């Protein structure tokens, strides 16, 4: 019974660690990296600003901020993303 408790505790700690690692902050950058790209239509009218992910991130991405405060990770090579970048007037530094 004691070994089962230890196994469950280890699984819980591992799960907590993996969940934290999923946030994927780049080292010494302070910004998050994108793990996947948004696959839907980008709501251009709801976009407020955008920024590029750090060069330290493993995946190049554009991050759009919506009026609701949501972040959308997008592929910078996608033609719809390029159009959205042109239309959004306030890129963040």
Swiss-Prot record:
It is found in: Secreted. Disulfide bonds join 33-57, 34-73. GO terms for biological process: cellular defense response; chemotaxis; immune response; inflammatory response; negative regulation of myoblast differentiation; signal transduction. GO terms for cellular component: extracellular space. Keywords: Chemotaxis, Cytokine, Disulfide bond, Inflammatory response, Secreted, Signal. Disruption phenotype: Knockout mice mount diminished T cell-dependent contact hypersensitivity responses and display a deficiency in rejection of allogeneic organ transplants. In hippocampus, the absolute cell numbers of microglia is significantly reduced compared to wild-type mice. Under homeostatic conditions, microglia possess a smaller cell volume, reduced cell surface area, number of branches and junctions, as well as total tree length compared to those of control mice. This specific morphology of microglia partially resembles that observed in lipopolysaccharide (LPS)-stimulated wild-type animals. Residues 1-23 form the signal peptide. Chemokine, which displays chemotactic activity for T lymphocytes, preferentially Th2 cells, but not monocytes or granulocytes. Therefore plays an important role in a wide range of inflammatory and immunological processes. Acts by binding to CCR4 at T-cell surface. Mediates GM-CSF/CSF2-driven pain and inflammation. In the brain, required to maintain the typical, highly branched morphology of hippocampal microglia under homeostatic conditions. This is C-C motif chemokine 17. The gene is Ccl17.
């Amino acid at each position: 019974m004691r070994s089962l408790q230890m196994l469950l505790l280890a699984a819980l700690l591992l799960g907590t660690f993996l969940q934290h690692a999923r946030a994927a902050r780049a080292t010494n950058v302070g910004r998050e990296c994108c793990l996947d790209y948004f696959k839907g239509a980008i709501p251009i009218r709801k976009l407020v600003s955008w920024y590029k992910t750090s060069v330290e991130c493993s995946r190049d991405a554009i991050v759009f901020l919506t009026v609701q405060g949501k972040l959308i990770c997008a592929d910078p090579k996608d033609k719809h993303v390029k159009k959205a970048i042109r239309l959004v007037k306030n890129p963040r530094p």
